[in-house]
Amino acid sequence: MAVQQKIRIKLKSYDHSLVDKWALRIIDVVKQTDAIIFGPIPLPTKSHVYTVNRSPHVDKKSREQFSFSSHKRLIEIMNPTSRTIDMLMKLELPSGVDVEIKS
């Protein structure tokens, strides 16, 4: 029984359209190398809410809330070749997308 290798790529950004665009671009690159792809799998969106006082001195009841959401996508690549890894390393991702790669 052969051991299958896999690479997990997790993309994270505050802009969902940016994450989706780059997930599809990674999939297009990997499809050229005949590797098996699972994804993009949408992971749960985390919402962060921060509450601050509007005034620095008085009116404790007057507050303002700021919120932002972080969007994540997961891509799994089964049986990657050296060509697959080379093509993934050549991709230049924008600064708004955080990439985490595990093998």
Curated annotation (Swiss-Prot):
GO biological process, one term: translation
Entry annotated with the keyword S-adenosyl-L-methionine: no
UniProt GO molecular function: structural constituent of ribosome; tRNA binding
One Pfam family of this chain: Ribosomal_S10
Gene Ontology CC annotation, any one: ribonucleoprotein complex
Gene3D superfamilies, per the entry: Ribosomal protein S10 domain
Domain of life of the source: Bacteria
Keywords: Ribonucleoprotein, Ribosomal protein
Keyword Ribosomal protein: yes
InterPro entries xref list: Ribosomal_uS10 (IPR001848), Ribosomal_uS10_CS (IPR018268), Ribosomal_uS10_dom (IPR027486), Ribosomal_uS10_dom_sf (IPR036838)
Coiled-coil stretches: none
Protein's job: Involved in the binding of tRNA to the ribosomes.
Family: Belongs to the universal ribosomal protein uS10 family.
Oligomeric and partner information: Part of the 30S ribosomal subunit.
Protein name: Small ribosomal subunit protein uS10
Natural source organism: Chlorobium chlorochromatii (strain CaD3)
